[in-house]
Amino acid sequence: MGAFLDKPKMEKHNAQGQGNGLRYGLSSMQGWRVEMEDAHTAVIGLPSGLETWSFFAVYDGHAGSQVAKYCCEHLLDHITNNQDFRGSAGAPSVENVKNGIRTGFLEIDEHMRVMSEKKHGADRSGSTAVGVLISPQHTYFINCGDSRGLLCRNRKVHFFTQDHKPSNPLEKERIQNAGGSVMIQRVNGSLAVSRALGDFDYKCVHGKGPTEQLVSPEPEVHDIERSEEDDQFIILACDGIWDVMGNEELCDFVRSRLEVTDDLEKVCNEVVDTCLYKGSRDNMSVILICFPSAPKVSAEAVKKEAELDKYLESRVEEIIKKQVEGVPDLVHVMRTLASENIPSLPPGGELASKRNVIEAVYNRLNPYKNDDTDSASTDDMW
């Protein structure tokens, strides 16, 4: 679960789509981890009378990818097909939806446990889940674990989910009541999240219900009334993103990228690359969902971006030419630039978000470059 590669796998999986007045893009990267354990769901237009609803989620697996993969394929069905969600005839009420989401999580968790026991020994993998269910009137934020979702409204972070960590007082109380302990901020000194799907080794305390176990599958659900004028975008991401970027930082960075491109896949790729260069060592997945009032491409912002790239290119060339013998390594170039007051760097991303631009110029000007040299070795992180 904690093993790392000698160099990161930087290939990305992308997707994008639109409908119901929404646009979305997503990006995921294995990064430094030995295995890719993340998964995701993106569905615009749900079946059975919910054509104007949409669902998006990120799943961050651990100790294997089985639970994350199963949830990405089946969690939505467990949510929308249970009686608590449907309630009476017609569109489900807010309380129906919230109860149905909770029931769906508990049902799929129990279903996976039964399936696992029927096989050769229980599956030991688990997964966080963070998602949004978007109706024409409401956005329902869903969280179980330490992945995170946030809503940017009127250029500010309006809402974000709370991470479920063992050190949280309420989580710690439940863990201790189930006979467990919190050591080095982990459940029984091992698991770093206090709520998750799967992780059945932590859900076998006799006399305790499913939401009273060492690790609970119960999600927190928050309903937020939509604001057509002010809602701009939603970000869903695993902790590989949040480990190196704060809520406001990521919100500011995404907003700045939306002012220079309307390609949401590209924006998500920039988020993932920037987090890698900021030092993230985990799998990374991010979904960006834009409302009609999301920032639009600005000619002024595009011009400033081009000027910044040109400035960085000239500075890299100057640094290389200044070297008396040979060519300085890329780490030296990055550290030199990091020590300077460079205007107009993307907020939140800063110099790390321009690593690809800098590296491209460096490689073009470096006659000694080895094409097999990894572009993000551990020594490069400054």
Curated annotation (Swiss-Prot):
EC id: 3.1.3.16
Post-translational modification: N-myristoylation is essential for the recognition of its substrates for dephosphorylation.
Entry keyword Lipoprotein: yes
CC cofactor note: Binds 2 magnesium or manganese ions per subunit.
Subunit relationships: Monomer. Interacts with SMAD2; the interaction dephosphorylates SMAD2 in its C-terminal SXS motif resulting in disruption of the SMAD2/SMAD4 complex, SMAD2 nuclear export and termination of the TGF-beta-mediated signaling. Interacts with SMAD2; the interaction dephosphorylates SMAD2 in its C-terminal SXS motif resulting in disruption of the SMAD2/SMAD4 complex, SMAD2 nuclear export and termination of the TGF-beta-mediated signaling. Interacts with the phosphorylated form of IKBKB/IKKB.
Role, per record: Enzyme with a broad specificity. Negatively regulates TGF-beta signaling through dephosphorylating SMAD2 and SMAD3, resulting in their dissociation from SMAD4, nuclear export of the SMADs and termination of the TGF-beta-mediated signaling. Dephosphorylates PRKAA1 and PRKAA2. Plays an important role in the termination of TNF-alpha-mediated NF-kappa-B activation through dephosphorylating and inactivating IKBKB/IKKB.
Protein name per the record: Protein phosphatase 1A
Gene that this polypeptide is encoded by: Ppm1a
